[in-house]
Curated annotation (Swiss-Prot):
This is Ribonuclease P protein component. Consists of a catalytic RNA component (M1 or rnpB) and a protein subunit. Keywords: Endonuclease, Hydrolase, Nuclease, RNA-binding, tRNA processing. GO terms for biological process: tRNA 3'-end processing; tRNA 5'-leader removal. NCBIfam families: rnpA. GO terms for cellular component: ribonuclease P complex. It holds the Pfam family Ribonuclease_P. RNaseP catalyzes the removal of the 5'-leader sequence from pre-tRNA to produce the mature 5'-terminus. It can also cleave other RNA substrates such as 4.5S RNA. The protein component plays an auxiliary but essential role in vivo by binding to the 5'-leader sequence and broadening the substrate specificity of the ribozyme. It comes from Mycoplasma genitalium (strain ATCC 33530 / DSM 19775 / NCTC 10195 / G37).
Length: 128
């Protein structure tokens, strides 16, 4: 029986794995640079959002730390998934992210969501 406190894992349809898509996202001009995360994003042709999380081994040597960060980020994306349009998002985690509280991490990703919505509104108005 599933415990209702813990969300079910992110669906495979919401994860990015193709190298070709990674390079396309990195070459896009839409990005968000923060102290603890950098995010690149691009509109996709799918009906859902997709996310990839990149954590360098040089910044977080222990796999336990890297996995904790990935789980927290996936959980945050799952919480805000109702507000997400179909975007491909590449999140690059910087040093110091693990020291933040979960609420601070949520705040960071809400800022990212706000930035994505601003870019979406700008691109929509520019295409008209």
């Amino acid at each position: 029986m599933l415990n209702s406190r813990f969300p079910v894992s992110v669906k495979k349809s919401h994860s990015l794995r193709e190298r070709k898509v990674f390079t396309t996202i990195l070459q896009s001009k839409t990005r968000f640079f923060g102290t603890f995360i950098n995010a690149y994003f691009i509109k996709n042709n799918h009906s859902t959002w997709r996310v990839a999380i990149s954590i360098a081994k040089t910044k977080y040597k222990l796999a336990v730390q890297r996995n904790l960060i990935k789980r927290q980020i996936r959980s945050i994306f799952q919480q805000i998934s109702n507000n997400l349009e179909p975007w491909d998002i590449l999140v690059i985690v910087n040093k110091g992210f693990i020291e933040l509280t979960f609420k601070e991490k949520q705040k960071l990703f809400l800022q990212l969501l706000k930035r994505i919505k601003e870019v979406d509104a700008y691109q929509t108005s520019a295409n008209k």
